[in-house]
Each structure stands twice: as structure tokens, then as C-alpha cells.
């Protein structure tokens, strides 16, 4: 078996043992780092079932420094998987959502001897991310993927979802932190270069010109004009996978699935 590790991965022996928990008893052919995410440690595991072709799944160690309650991330994923069983995408166009791969004992996660939480999800085959918008058609597909996913989860009751990153999208909170930091900082430091000074002033001006809008969404939520809906909290361009013909086929990185404002 081939095991390639990254600098933030678990030791090869324990990584193999953990992957085996999700492999349904099948031999593991390889384990390799997957993607360029900065939060979780992510690996692509390939197994070799006796009766079928090789199969692959994604293995992740959830970063408990970011997600303080990893079990809630996994719980949300389980709720999503269950919801989509009865709310499949319309026929006529491919669309897939990663689903939970359970352990041999039927659990949604595995906790190792160090207390780390590991989970496995299905791998979306024949699709890949693109880091930046390439053209108008690509932008259209990104929009389609974002809309398709949120249409599918629109009937999911937000009471069933935990808020895995409380305050993640609350702009006034960030603005308040910025104001405190600005008051404490020495903005007249003579050690900065002219370029740094201009860049800093550009940022200060940018925020000053827009800060009156920072409370709009939260005020609308408080007044009942907007309500919480199930959302993907981090729908970056490279979280939408494209098929070989350029069509959006999946929205991945579902750790930030949570109640929020879709606006």
C-alpha cells in the first residue's frame, strides 16, 4: 500500500489504521493528500474490493481548533445526507453531493487515541475544482452550482442544523473588532514604508466608506424581514467542482453547512 503524507498529517501507520475503519474490510491501495485546504487534513483513499473495481473515498481529520465541536460538523453532514436521500436533483443533468461513509460499526466518525475526530465522505469522480473564474461561461456554472445546492437544501429545517461556527458571518462583530484594533494600533508609525502607508490608508478609507452598511442584514434579521435558512457558509469558486465539459456537478467542503442568511 502507498501512503503519502503532508506536513500536517498523522503518522503513516495510524493513518492507515484510521482509513481502514471506513474501508468496509477492503484492502487499501493508497492514501494521498487531497486538495489545498487550510483547515482540515484531507486525504484521498483508494481501496480494492474483491468483486468490483477500485473505489475511492475522502478521509478527513476535523480541525478542532477551528471547529470546537467536531461532532456537530459530522452531525450536520449526517442530516444533509438523510435530507438529500428524499430530495434528489432533477433528472437531466448530473449533480452529486458528498455523502457520509460510515465505519464498519456503522458510526459516522472515528475518534483516534489522541481524541481527534475523523470522518469519511464519498469522492466525486470525474470532476475537479478551478481556483479562479476563467470566463463568463465558467461564472455562469459557478452560479448554477451555488443555486442548485441551495435549492436542494431549501426545505431542510434549520432547527436540525447546528451552528458550527457561531458569528462567522456577523459583519458588525468584525467591524467592532476592527474598531478596537484601530484604537489600539499606532497608525502613525514612522517605520512603515510609503507603500505600506498608502495601502493602510486605502484599507482605512475603504472600510470608512462602507461601514454604515455593516448592520443592514443583521438589522433586517432582527426585525423579521430576513430569516435564517440552511446555507453553505464558504462557497468559494474552488468549492464548486466542474465536469470535463465544464458543467458544475457538485458543491463540496460542507463543514460550514449551517443556519444563516442566504443574502
Task: Annotate each language-model stretch with its function.
Residues 68, 242-263:
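Active-site Asp-x-Gly
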Residues 237-238:
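Catalytic-loop Lys-Pro-X-Asn motif of eukaryotic-like protein kinases
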Residues 1-32, 80:
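Juxta-kinase regulatory segment immediately upstream of eukaryotic protein kinase catalytic domains
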Residues 24-49:
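ATP-binding glycine-rich phosphate-binding loop
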Residues 2-7, 32-36, 60-61, 67-71, ...:
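ATP-dependent phospho-/nucleotidyl transfer catalytic cores
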Residues 46-56, 244-248:
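Active-site beta-strand-loop-beta-strand hairpin of nuclease catalytic cores
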Residues 53-76, 82-160:
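ATP-binding pocket architecture of kinase catalytic cores
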Amino acid at each position: 500500500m502507498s501512503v503519502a503524507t503532508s506536513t500536517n498529517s498523522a503518522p503513516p501507520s495510524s493513518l492507515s489504521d484510521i482509513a481502514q475503519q471506513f474501508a468496509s474490510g477492503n484492502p487499501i491501495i493508497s492514501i494521498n493528500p487531497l486538495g489545498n485546504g487550510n483547515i482540515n487534513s484531507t486525504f484521498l483513499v483508494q481501496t480494492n474490493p474483491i468483486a468490483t473495481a477500485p473505489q475511492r473515498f475522502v478521509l478527513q481529520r476535523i480541525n478542532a481548533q477551528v471547529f470546537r465541536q467536531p461532532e456537530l460538523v459530522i452531525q450536520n453532514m449526517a442530516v444533509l445526507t438523510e435530507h438529500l436521500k428524499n430530495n434528489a436533483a432533477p433528472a437531466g443533468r448530473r449533480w452529486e453531493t458528498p455523502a457520509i461513509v460510515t465505519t464498519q460499526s456503522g458510526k459516522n466518525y472515528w475518534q483516534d487515541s489522541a481524541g481527534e475526530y475523523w470522518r469519511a465522505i464519498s469522492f466525486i469522480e470525474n470532476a475537479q475544482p478551478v481556483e479562479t473564474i476563467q470566463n463568463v461561461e465558467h461564472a455562469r456554472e459557478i452560479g448554477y452550482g451555488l443555486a442548485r445546492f441551495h435549492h436542494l437544501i431549501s426545505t431542510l429545517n434549520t432547527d436540525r442544523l447546528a451552528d458550527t461556527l457561531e458569528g462567522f458571518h456577523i459583519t458588525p462583530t468584525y467591524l467592532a473588532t476592527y474598531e478596537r484594533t484601530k484604537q489600539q494600533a499606532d497608525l502613525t508609525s514612522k517605520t512603515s514604508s510609503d507603500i505600506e502607508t498608502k495601502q493602510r490608508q486605502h484599507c482605512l478609507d475603504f472600510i470608512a466608506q462602507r461601514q454604515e452598511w455593516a448592520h443592514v442584514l443583521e438589522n433586517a434579521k432582527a426585525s423579521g424581514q430576513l430569516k435564517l435558512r440552511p446555507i453553505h457558509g464558504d462557497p468559494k469558486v474552488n468549492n464548486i467542482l466542474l465536469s470535463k465539459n465544464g458543467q458544475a456537478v457538485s458543491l463540496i467542503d460542507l463543514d460550514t453547512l449551517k443556519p444563516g442568511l442566504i443574502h
